[in-house]
Design a protein with these regions (language model features):
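Cytochrome P450
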Residues: 1-159
Length: 159
């Protein structure tokens, strides 16, 4: 279970921070969402802990007018794709009723996250418990600065 541990932990931290900095109470959030899965998917889209992956091109390909040669190392910017305004209406806003739920945080194809179902379950249970209480930030947290994994050094909250 270690492979997905950091991603799930940082999704919880990023998601809790996003919930606490919204201009809505937890009660308002609960009243406008029918399914905790909508909360999970929108929070991981909004602030994905895994911002990018490196891959190697398996064949020559042209993307957006750029030629990429077979064997070239490429960076897949998942966090950027999740904020693409050509795909998501108002991508920099949290919308738990978002019609398009197909984001890139879980990867795709042969690289789709094998632990997705477990992570969704863990995140759903956790956010259900979080939304059942009232929390507030004690102080604004600082990011870890880790390359590739987006999260906080610590997230101090009170209930």
């Amino acid at each position: 279970l270690n492979a997905g541990h950091e991603a799930t932990v940082n999704t919880l931290g990023n998601g809790l921070h996003a919930l606490l900095t919204l201009d809505k109470s937890f009660d308002e959030i609960k009243s406008e969402t029918e399914n905790i899965n909508d909360v999970v998917e929108e929070l991981i889209r909004f602030d994905s802990p895994l911002q990018f992956f490196q891959r190697y091109a398996l064949e020559d390909v042209e993307i957006g007018g750029h030629n990429i040669k077979k064997g070239s190392k490429v960076a897949i910017l998942l966090g950027s794709a999740n904020r693409d305004p050509r795909v998501f209406k108002n991508p920099d806003q949290i919308n738990f009723k978002r019609e398009i739920k197909d984001h890139s945080s879980w990867g795709g194809g042969i690289h789709f996250c094998i632990g997705t179902h477990l992570a969704r379950l863990e995140l759903g249970v956790s956010f259900n418990h979080i939304l059942a209480k009232q929390f507030s930030l004690i102080e604004e947290p600082s990011r870890t600065g880790a390359f590739g994994i987006r999260g906080f050094k610590e997230l101090l909250v009170s209930s």
